[in-house]
């Protein structure tokens, strides 16, 4: 009867058991020697502290306890495939790993530096000394086209149209003169902007 009973505590595995463990591919580093009695082995789990048997705790030395130094599996990776939401855990993990995180729960996010505005091709040509043709400003170009259209409509001979176009042309001429003075004030270098000839009031037919 006594021989049929299983012995208490940890025992040394048999040769067949050792061969079976090696065949299964269990790493020998997972077996730690816990008891001062030679030949007693115990398999432990990754990341846990190996503790001696409670029956031998009094007789064993505290120096027998050894911490498993094998790499631990990430807590987030272990929950990745079982449908558990790890958003809160991941946020705490990221906040704890940042150097700008403070214990009171306030942390800062480093923003990107402001990007410099790209240098236009015109500015590059001007800085290199190349001569380029300046474009006419949009308001001035609009007034010039409007004046040309007004002149064509003026020749239609319709009295109401001619009256409205004459008033519009006078206002356009006034705007052109003001715009030229404004452009000259903003160009201290003295660059000359070529303007198309605007017909004077003397050359216009009387209404």
Swiss-Prot record:
Protein source organism: Rat coronavirus (strain 681) (RCV-SDAV)
CDD domains: embe-CoV_Protein-I_like
Biological function: Structural protein that is not essential for the viral replication either in tissue culture or in its natural host.
Domain of life of the native organism: Viruses
Annotated transmembrane regions: none
Keyword list, A-Z: Virion
UniProt subcellular location: Virion
Highest classification ranks of the organism: Viruses, Riboviria, Orthornavirae, Pisuviricota, Pisoniviricetes
GO CC terms in record: virion component
Name of the protein in question: Protein I
Family: Belongs to the coronavirus I protein family.
Major localisation: virion
A Pfam family reported for this protein in Swiss-Prot or TrEMBL: Corona_I
Note: The gene encoding this protein is included within the N gene (alternative ORF).
